[in-house]
């Protein structure tokens, strides 16, 4: 029987990600279960160069667009009561969450 739940969170907006992480931490502190984390993982950075002039005449000038993806991992004891409350946590649209029982 699994005794821990691993919660993976990722988002492009770090403020919303930290908001959800703080909600999970306060939930664990209120219920008194053991929590490990949040463990920050390396930030993925994607860069897309785009040519400013689409017709290609003149000098080639480039704009660089980038997107950063911030990730966190939290390990929490998988008590049934805690898991039910965890499902009720408000998660913004740009924060993605994945729960795995280990």
From Swiss-Prot:
InterPro entries to which the protein is assigned, alphabetical: Ribosomal_uS10 (IPR001848), Ribosomal_uS10_CS (IPR018268), Ribosomal_uS10_dom (IPR027486), Ribosomal_uS10_dom_sf (IPR036838), Ribosomal_uS10_euk/arc (IPR005729)
GO molecular-function terms, A-Z: structural constituent of ribosome; tRNA binding
GO biological process terms, semicolon-separated: translation
The organism's place on the tree of life at top rank: Archaea
Matches recorded under PROSITE patterns: RIBOSOMAL_S10 (PS00361)
Swiss-Prot/TrEMBL keywords: Ribonucleoprotein, Ribosomal protein
Cited HAMAP family: Ribosomal_uS10
Function of the molecule: Involved in the binding of tRNA to the ribosomes.
Family named by the database record: Belongs to the universal ribosomal protein uS10 family.
Name of the protein described by the UniProt record: Small ribosomal subunit protein uS10
Organism (species): Sulfurisphaera tokodaii (strain DSM 16993 / JCM 10545 / NBRC 100140 / 7)
């Amino acid at each position: 029987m699994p005794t821990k739940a691993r919660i993976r969170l990722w988002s492009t907006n770090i403020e919303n990600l930290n908001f959800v992480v703080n909600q999970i931490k306060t939930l664990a502190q209120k219920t008194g279960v053991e929590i490990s984390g949040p463990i920050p993982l390396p930030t993925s950075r994607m860069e897309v160069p785009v040519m400013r002039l689409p017709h290609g005449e003149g000098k080639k000038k480039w704009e660089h667009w980038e997107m950063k993806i911030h990730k966190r991992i939290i390990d929490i004891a998988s008590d049934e009561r805690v898991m039910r409350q965890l499902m009720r946590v408000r998660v913004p649209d740009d924060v993605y969450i994945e729960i795995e029982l280990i």
